[in-house]
Amino acid sequence: MAHPVQLGFQDAASPIMEELLYFHDHTLMIMFLISSLVLYIISLMLTTKLTHTSTMDAQEVETVWTILPAAILILIALPSLRILYMMDEITSPSLTLKTMGHQWYWSYEYTDYENLCFDSYMTPCSDLKPGELRLLEVDNRVVLPTELSIRTLISSEDVLHSWTVPSLGVKTDAIPGRLNQATLMASRPGVYYGQCSEICGANHSFMPIVLELIPLKHFEEWLLFTL
């Protein structure tokens, strides 16, 4: 989860989020090198008295500044496309979770089981227990197993919403009349928080998402207790 005055990403808890962090560092390093080169050239131009006013063209320089940016863009595009296809690929999911956005709460349905569905509202500040987080706790958490591929089907009953859990690298728009899908797989147990990330009205800030990821054995016990 996020912390006050946090500047970086949340700790990755899924393979996809780890790949996104690697890609971020990769791209940031390329940008840093380009910025350093540009600053060096600017400082060189400001400090030297040498000029070439009679130069009309320079084929070598033009070739370099055409090929070099193209190569840099390829170095950025290839890892990006790889992650894009990884996020879109859903093969043999172990569980399917249907998520519907409402003004201003979420409803969930475990489509693999009968009558396992519930609404998830934000817990009011007056009902918070010691240690619970303001504006992030809900009355019904989504319980899912770890280390299993889970497909989420996401849509909306009214306006645009966005189902987002940063630690798991998931952010999918909930669009009325359209069913989007995403895949998630947690690499370790824990409680992961998210929020609606699409402005959806007056109470947009009060649509938290809480996922409780537990080992498969405990998930089966939870199913027996719930059903």
UniProtKB/Swiss-Prot annotation:
Entry's Gene Ontology BP terms: ATP synthesis coupled electron transport
Residues that coordinate or bind Cu cation A1: H161, C196, C200, M207
What EC number(s) has UniProt assigned to this enzyme? 7.1.1.9
Mitochondrial matrix compartment ranges equal: 46-59
Q: Which portions of this protein are annotated as coiled-coil regions?
A: none
Q: Report how it sits in the membrane.
A: Multi-pass membrane protein
Molecular-function GO term, any one: copper ion binding
What cofactor does this one take? Cu cation
Positions bound to Cu cation A2: C196, E198, C200, H204
Q: Name one GO cellular component term.
A: mitochondrial inner membrane
What the protein does comes down to: Component of the cytochrome c oxidase, the last enzyme in the mitochondrial electron transport chain which drives oxidative phosphorylation. The respiratory chain contains 3 multisubunit complexes succinate dehydrogenase (complex II, CII), ubiquinol-cytochrome c oxidoreductase (cytochrome b-c1 complex, complex III, CIII) and cytochrome c oxidase (complex IV, CIV), that cooperate to transfer electrons derived from NADH and succinate to molecular oxygen, creating an electrochemical gradient over the inner membrane that drives transmembrane transport and the ATP synthase.
Question: Could you tell me what this protein is called?
Answer: Cytochrome c oxidase subunit 2
The organism named in the record is Varecia variegata
